[in-house]
Amino acid sequence: MRHKIAIFSDVHGNYTALKAVYEDMQEQGVTESWFLGDLFAPGSGAQDLWDLMQKINPEVYIRGNWDDLMIRGAAGKIALEKPSKVYMERLAMDVAAKVDPQVLATMKRWPMRVVKQINDVRIAITHDLPEINFGQQLYPTLPTENFNKLFVEDDLDLAIYAHVHHPIMRYSSEEQIVLNPGSVGQPFNRHVKFQQDLRAQYLIVTIDDDGVSGIDFRKVAYSHPDELLRAANANIPYIELYQRQMETGEVHTHDYPLLARLNDKYGYLREAKEYEAQHAIHEKSDF
């Protein structure tokens, strides 16, 4: 049997990009889809984005680090000692205010790892490492030994992960295939010319009776001005940063001086403290 599987990840709230990817999936005639995590924030999408995901109806959902941060932030559980953590808390507050409570409850149940058997091909699916969905252990330029960690079981043929926002095909030391679909809503690349290409990214893997017969890295154009208009209409926090991302691909998640200025200017730190005081629970985050 022939399977044409759309694999997508790291939407980061970008409704307009995901809608374009979904339309491309339909045009390409995919038979199923797998989602590898990081659905919300910092983009425009909230309940509308969740509703779009229900239309796509992935057979696999994986929980990413930003999914965990949205869940924890919505519960007031991100300690606020750094500007970046205020940023995450304030984004999570915004998502929590706009989605049905069952959305975050459902996300909390998403697994960190799934193993699928497609015909004779055995595939491990994660957001990052099998037991850790954050960090830079699998950045694309790192040694092969790092990627061997994706192959927990000896009988695996293929590992697919996400998180680093780069389309990737490479091999383990045993020449098993490692794939990454890139990012729907927030593509990254240190090479300036490649970073200027801000199309939505995803992957189609075709598997037939003989094995893996196709690996298609897709790039889909969409309207960045339309996404910015949606963000403005949704009154998202940190919209200046989202505008920069839409225009240049730059993100400022770890730009502490800039985040501190915005947190002070718009009262985000005060709002986050008030929100967390209502929940009265503080935990260390991984951000």
Language-model features: locations:
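Active-site neighborhood of phospho(di)ester-bond hydrolases with catalytic His/Asp-centered motifs
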Residues: 7-9, 33-38, 42, 60-65, ...
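Acidic, His/Gly-enriched loop-helix segments that form or flank divalent-metal centers
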Residues: 97-218
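N-terminal active-site segment of His-dependent metallophosphoesterases
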Residues: 1-52, 56
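Short aromatic-enriched loop/helix-cap "lid" or pocket-rim segments at secondary-structure transitions
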Residues: 72-77, 137, 191-192, 228-230
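Active-site neighborhood of divalent metal-dependent phosphoester bond hydrolases
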Residues: 56-114, 141-150
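Acidic, His/Gly-rich catalytic cores of divalent-metal-dependent hydrolytic chemistry
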Residues: 173-287
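Active-site environment of divalent metal-dependent phosphoester hydrolases
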Residues: 12-17, 41-44, 66-71, 160-172, ...
